[in-house]
């Protein structure tokens, strides 16, 4: 074949080579179609022209398959094109039939979302996060009242503690003790009792006299 060397791939890119071959084959085929009558007259030239057309078509098909395979190899789709072998067919189409799982074995149960409270750092369910945060930060009406009461109680307890400590300190400075206070109280009580008994006796004597 005289023109078979012109159809060989040049050291260019795959797409450029295919475009070049397609253009060259189109030109050669057009030339053969124009000179078809003259080629019929010469059996030798007719044989060469038919061989040229066959080789051009074969090269075009082989180049197309090569470029497509190369593209699939680079993109990683060659394994998908090959498919799954018969030995791996059963494992490839295994269907999961367990409860709460889909056909691929993925859980279908809804997982409850938890949120962390920024105030107390506790894990709270997402559905109860808003009311918990409102109560925890004292932003609601009832919560604000409770928080105010707690604050007032805290202030009252601190005030009573401070007054008690002040009283104890003042008692210690004057030198008074609990025992002395008890003695004074008992003596006053005895005096009151003796005075009352003397009054009762005097009234009885006066009632017994005659005038």
Curated annotation (Swiss-Prot):
Region annotated Disordered, chain positions: 149-211
Subcellular location field: Nucleus, Nucleoplasm; Cytoplasm
Pfam families attached to this UniProt entry: Sgf11
Main location: nucleus
Keywords, ordered alphabetically: Activator, Chromatin regulator, Cytoplasm, Metal-binding, mRNA transport, Nucleus, Phosphoprotein, Protein transport, Transcription, Transcription regulation, Translocation, Transport, Zinc, Zinc-finger
GO biological process, one term: chromatin organization
Gene3D superfamilies: Classic Zinc Finger (3.30.160.60)
Subunit organization: Component of some SAGA transcription coactivator-HAT complexes, at least composed of Ada2b, not/nonstop, Pcaf/Gcn5, Sgf11 and Spt3. Within the SAGA complex, Sgf11, e(y)2, and not/nonstop form an additional subcomplex of SAGA called the DUB module (deubiquitination module). Interacts directly with not/nonstop. Interacts with the AMEX complex component xmas-2. Interacts with Cbp80; important for promoter recruitment of Sgf11 that is not associated with the DUB module.
Function (record text): Component of the transcription regulatory histone acetylation (HAT) complex SAGA, a multiprotein complex that activates transcription by remodeling chromatin and mediating histone acetylation and deubiquitination. Within the SAGA complex, participates in a subcomplex that specifically deubiquitinates histone H2B. The SAGA complex is recruited to specific gene promoters by activators, where it is required for transcription. Required for nuclear receptor-mediated transactivation. Binds independently on SAGA to promoters in an RNA-dependent manner.
Comment block on domains: The long N-terminal helix forms part of the 'assembly lobe' of the SAGA deubiquitination module.
Protein name: SAGA-associated factor 11 homolog 2
Species whose genome carries this gene: Drosophila grimshawi
Organism phylogeny: Eukaryota, Metazoa, Ecdysozoa, Arthropoda, Hexapoda
